[in-house]
């Protein structure tokens, strides 16, 4: 098609010379070439794949027809500004047939078009700059890890205690303890060798953990680990963040069998660990034993003398029971319901817990936010709040939060 257009242009070159005797028309075309900045147009044409002659000479009209195909989409946006540009954008292809109606206004409006060519070039380039800014690669930034992958605030003793207490048999093997910790806390799914060594050291060097050998009915590898029966409540109110006291067992077994037979009660008390009994209860029990021995020795006396030791013994018994009751109020039993946000009942899912949500508990646990495969039941469903008797203070939380998070009424 290019050859056909060229041939058509050469055929009509002689006819145009008969119509226009004056050669100024062609000089004005060359002036228009410099005024319009056709060099930049030709470079734009070469960028789009249309290579043609850079100088507008004999085939100037032919170049104009090709310029229309490449430039009219970008020039039509500016054509309403000038009348000459509108004539150029509309009738560029018809220049081969009627050159004089379009060339004279274009030659007259050369300065205005020259001012607009730079603007057109800038419009052609601006999408490229904008796209380069959009597609610019962002610098890799090291963001902080979320709370689900943060280190839990529990010690290794707390983790082991939680794992053992949640098991139905209250004893676990070492691999089961590892697996329970990794399932509940995603942080421990990496660097396993480090923290597993720490778990083994904690099991070996703490008196609150006992190693139970496997029974014949439970074949397998590895011994079981369980909590010492006298360890009691090591963690205050079921909170595993801090131990209330360190458990140490007095392993002072009597080697004399005669002392075992004569002093069975004292031997059992020496085998017991110091986390179970207080000095006050020991002194009261000693006084009780002494009073009973006095009562036995005084049985051979007269009834009035014998009545006084019995009444004294009853008085001491009542005092001893009152001391035990007082200690029962001070020291909670081993089996109790944990209502602390970091207790094992709140960490593990339980279908029996249908308590209301305490907003302070919600805030604390969502701050740490330890996810697990049971994240749906752990994070929301199993966080039991205070008991039904201890209703939450809703006025405080309404003052703290602008909008209530959960229905605390």
UniProtKB/Swiss-Prot annotation:
It is found in: Nucleus. Residues 150-241 bind DNA. Residues 250-262 have a biased composition (Basic and acidic residues). Residues 250-315 are annotated as: Disordered. Keywords: Developmental protein, DNA-binding, Nucleus. One of its GO terms (biological process) is anatomical structure morphogenesis. PANTHER family: FORKHEAD BOX PROTEIN, HEPATOCYTE NUCLEAR FACTOR 3-BETA. May play a crucial role in specification of both the axial mesendoderm and the ventral nervous system. This is Forkhead box protein A2. The gene is foxa2.
């Amino acid at each position: 098609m290019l050859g056909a257009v060229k041939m058509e242009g050469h055929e009509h070159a002689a006819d145009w010379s008969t119509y226009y005797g004056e050669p100024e028309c062609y000089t004005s075309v060359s002036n228009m070439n410099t005024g319009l900045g056709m060099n930049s147009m030709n470079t734009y044409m070469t960028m789009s794949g249309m290579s043609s002659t850079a100088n507008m000479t004999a085939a100037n009209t032919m170049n104009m027809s090709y310029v229309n195909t490449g430039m009219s989409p970008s020039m039509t946006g500016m054509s309403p500004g000038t009348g000459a540009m509108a004539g150029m954008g509309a009738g560029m292809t018809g220049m081969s047939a009627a050159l004089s109606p379009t060339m004279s206004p274009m030659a007259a409006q050369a300065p205005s078009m020259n001012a607009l060519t730079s603007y057109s070039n800038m419009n052609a380039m601006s999408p490229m700059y904008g796209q380069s800014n959009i597609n610019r690669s962002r610098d890799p930034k090291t963001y902080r890890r979320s709370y689900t992958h943060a280190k839990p605030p529990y010690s290794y003793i707390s983790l082991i205690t939680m794992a053992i207490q949640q098991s139905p048999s209250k004893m676990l093997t070492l691999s089961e303890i590892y697996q329970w910790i990794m399932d509940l806390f995603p942080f421990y799914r990496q660097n396993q060798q480090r923290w597993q060594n720490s778990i083994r050291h904690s099991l070996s060097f703490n008196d609150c953990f006992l190693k139970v050998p496997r029974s014949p009915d439970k074949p397998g590898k590895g011994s079981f680990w369980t909590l010492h029966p006298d360890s009691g409540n090591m963690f205050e109110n079921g909170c595993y963040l801090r131990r209330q006291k360190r458990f140490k067992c007095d392993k002072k077994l009597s080697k004399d069998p005669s002392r075992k037979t004569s002093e069975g009660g004292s031997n059992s008390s020496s085998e017991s660990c110091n986390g179970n009994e207080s000095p006050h209860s020991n002194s009261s029990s000693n006084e009780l034993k002494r009073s009973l021995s006095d009562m036995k020795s005084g049985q051979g006396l007269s009834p009035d003398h014998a009545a006084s030791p019995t009444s004294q013994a009853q008085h001491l018994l009542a005092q001893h029971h009152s001391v035990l009751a007082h200690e029962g109020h001070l020291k909670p039993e081993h089996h109790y319901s944990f209502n602390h946000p970091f207790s094992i009942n709140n960490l593990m899912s339980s279908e029996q817990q249908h308590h209301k949500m305490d907003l302070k508990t919600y805030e604390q646990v969502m701050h740490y936010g330890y996810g697990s495969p049971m994240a749906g039941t752990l994070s929301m469903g199993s966080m039991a709040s205070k008991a039904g008797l201890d209703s939450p203070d809703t006025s405080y939380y309404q003052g703290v939060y602008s909008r209530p998070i959960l229905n605390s009424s």
